[in-house]
Every structure is written in C-alpha cells, then in structure tokens.
Amino acid sequence: MNTVTIKLKKVPDLYLECESVTPDKFAGKSLEEIAALPCSEGKRNYTLGDWFEISGAAGATADETKIDVYGPGTSKCKYFGAWMTAGEVVVNG
C-alpha cells in the first residue's frame, strides 16, 4: 500500500472542508495533482496545497492508497475520507 502524508500548515479560522482527502480522489495522481484538489474554508475556495504539505505517493487504485493526516488543528478540518470506497485514512492530531 502506498502512503500519502499530508501535514496541516496552519490552523484554519473556520472549519476547513476537505472532501477531496480520500483514497478514491488521490489514487493514480501525482503530488502536484493532489495539491491542486479543492477544499474550502467558509465561502472561500482553496486547494489542498494551500493548506497542507503533501509528500509520499498515491497508489494506482484507492485500495492501494493510504492517507496519513498530521498537524495541530486537524480538529478544525471536516470530511476526511467522506464517501471513500476503499483504502485507508488515518488522522493524527
């Protein structure tokens, strides 16, 4: 299983909606493509790269992809793993 590690750069003021943080959406993508996936804080739209340091490598399929999330402030992030069908998401924070 390949692992992508994402580390929150700063604590968001409002809740950060992270529906894109799923093995399904990371699978088969490069780190640059993962960093370009959308997230939002309130009414403002961002990319994952705006909020997270991203390293590692995604698997070819969701089943082969694990995501480790780190950083203070992860309690202010919502929807990690929302609607995922396979793989693994571990939130440490």
Residue ranges of each PLM-predicted region?
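Charge-rich, low-hydrophobicity low-complexity segments
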Residues: 1-93
